[in-house]
Amino acid sequence: MKSSICCFSGYRPEKMPPDLPEGSAAFDRMLQRLRWSIRRASGAGYRHFLSGMSRGFDLWAAEAVLELQEQGHAIDLWAVVAFPGMEQYWEPEWQRRYHAVLSRAVKKFPVSAKYAPECYTLRDRFLVERSSRCICFFDGVPGGTAYTVRYARRCGLLIDNLAERQLCFDDLNIIE
């Protein structure tokens, strides 16, 4: 089963590079690479996509999975929530997006019953330990994404890093 599961890891909006604000042409290109990576993983047999459901890359990735699912791709979304209510202090638009995505996830995994200092690390480990591939946006900034990508590498996951300037997908090069 693990061979058909892919997780996501990436930054919250405020940690994304300043040249990638949501709605910009550069952001749209990143989303295009994200959708391409999901389609590529689906073509390689991945059917289940795990999102950590945080603002930013996690939710953008979850929305992309749902969009591709609507287009007929045989994939589904699993929501891995650090703790119930983690979205309650977010901006209203992010709360709306979170609930829209959560309502369409076929599986929901609350990792902790309530907030605890280690709940996000536990969530990140849950994502990695159940997956064999990780699609991420990581450009070297320290924090939770750095931890998750390092852990995924140690666990032997295939890594598709959308922050790399040149992504090679078999014989296709996507160059910015």
List where the protein language model places each region.
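Acidic/glycine-enriched connector segments
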Residues: 1-175
